[in-house]
Amino acid sequence: MSMQDPLADMLTRIRNAQMAEKSVVSMPSSTLKVAVAKVLKDEGYIAGYEVNGEAKPQLSIELKYFEGRPVIEEVKRVSRPGLRQYKSVDDLPKVRGGLGVSIVSTNKGVMTDRAARAAGVGGEVLCTVF
């Protein structure tokens, strides 16, 4: 079976692993997944990540918990292959009044909505995390 939306698969694996209280989740690696994992790490939603293997690289994400509860309460895919969501810098969404983040793919790389506003660029809204 071919994977139609690898990023949605990544987010689902993270969500399922946190519900099962796993400490680490692994998945096939890609450039986009590593960029999203870097943003999640920089924002403090995951403890860490690493890419293992040469021929078929695997991305391992170390999940983060606070007082026994997952740090990521909600993660949603916004732009999907069947309906891409592109937003200008003025239209970038705020998640829960600025408490969460939107992860945006811009021509300057994958970044949070706050960083995109600061850089003055819009792009494809990949997902929201709270």
Curated annotation (Swiss-Prot):
This protein is called what? Answer: Small ribosomal subunit protein uS8
Q: Which HAMAP family match?
A: Ribosomal_uS8_B (MF_01302_B)
Annotated SUPFAM superfamilies = Ribosomal protein S8
What is one term from the GO cellular component aspect held by the record? ribosome
Stored Pfam families? Ribosomal_S8
Q: What's this protein's function? A: One of the primary rRNA binding proteins, it binds directly to 16S rRNA central domain where it helps coordinate assembly of the platform of the 30S subunit.
Gene name per UniProt: rpsH
GO BP terms in the entry? translation
InterPro entries recorded for this chain? Answer: Ribosomal_uS8, Ribosomal_uS8_CS, Ribosomal_uS8_sf
Keywords per UniProt: Ribonucleoprotein, Ribosomal protein, RNA-binding, rRNA-binding
